[in-house]
Amino acid sequence: QQRYLNAKRYVKLAIVADRSMVTKHNGKLKKLRKWIYRIVNTINEVYRSLNILVALVYLEIWSKEDLINVTSAAKDTLASFGNWRATDLLKRRSHDAAHLLTNIKFDGTTVGKAYVASMCQQDSSVGINQDHSKINLLVALTMAHELGHNLGMSHDVVNTEKQCNCGTCVMAPTISDQISKLFSNCSKNDYENFLTLYKPQCILNEPSKTDIVSPPVCGNELLEVGEECDCGSPETCQNPCCDAATCKLTSGSQCAKGLCCDQCKFSKSGTECRAAKDDCDIAESCTGQSADCPTDDLQRNGKPCQNNAGYCYNGKCPIMLNQCISFYGSNATVAPDICFNYNLKGEGNFYCRKEQATIFPCAQKDKKCGRLFCVLGPTGKRISCKNTYSEDDPNYGMVDLGTKCEDGKVCNSNRECVDVNTAY
């Protein structure tokens, strides 16, 4: 648990500057870009104390017209921006969170708004920020604050039982003249709780050099174009393989970090760098030519797993028993065959396939690839065939694809029970 919490995280940030920002900078896009790069550099600096690096991986400037309706109603603007991000921006560029920068004044004293505990979520990993000051640092701290909300942090409330011992930290409810780049103990707790509860996966992946669109800064701990390594400032760098002043490897070093970097040299070929997580995963080993561990690879589909209870499918071992347990709890088991006869009817929710409104009943041999049936506890003479479905998700409550339906057979994407050797 502690190792999970202490792992380095990378927020790959997309920033959108709207038309009002272009007007504010008199159409000088180069000047506007510089302003934004400075903001991101500050945000990265602020978050390094939490072992988070923030990298700008995309910058979009709406120089002709706004692609959403940006208004003084912060709540509405945030909702439209979240929607646009999910339906448009995410399809064009992969990123973890998107923030809007606008010169439009929001109602009341609001200078920013963001969804809380939403990092990595498709339509809510967003924030909106007003470019409210001539002082770059103040705007940067506003965006850092809104990003804090995405990462699960609530406001530091003074005089509560929580005792957030910091009046001017990043998550203070209002901006004050005393500028602080620090997070309170409450913010740190909120962030750790967010990691534990939501387990956001997207921020575990490091951006590649070419993903980062801002000019390289030696000493920001991000590996960028033109750098061989980046271990932070000369004062804080603890890495003997990297020269902090130049971001080049020290003499005789082959690498500065990586799962296959050992004491500044590439690990020997064949050294295991990622153990197999389970039956359907493969262990990876170093090549001897690189500091990176090869891409995480999976066992082939159809390989027996969990003592022949199932067959691997896309890195998982789908078996009906586990599906029943996930729906009904630990005393659930797979129902007897007689329950699966409902799938032969092709009525209501009992079928193998549904295309538009047409329902296709299961053939006798495929009945265990349709709706899943489970029983709870010991069964007496009367069997209660439990099943579940959802109006919103047609696959919910169906037997998972790749599940073993008979010895040597699995459910394919057409929900037919077919030979495992020819299924994939």
Swiss-Prot record:
Its main location: secreted. InterPro entries: ADAM_Cys-rich, Disintegrin_CS, Disintegrin_dom, Disintegrin_dom_sf, MetalloPept_cat_dom_sf, Peptidase_M12B, Reprolysin_adamalysin. Ca(2+) 1 binds at D96, C202, N205. Gene3D superfamilies: Collagenase (Catalytic Domain), Disintegrin domain. GO terms for biological process: proteolysis. GO terms for molecular function: metal ion binding; metalloendopeptidase activity; toxin activity. This is Zinc metalloproteinase-disintegrin-like brevilysin H2a.
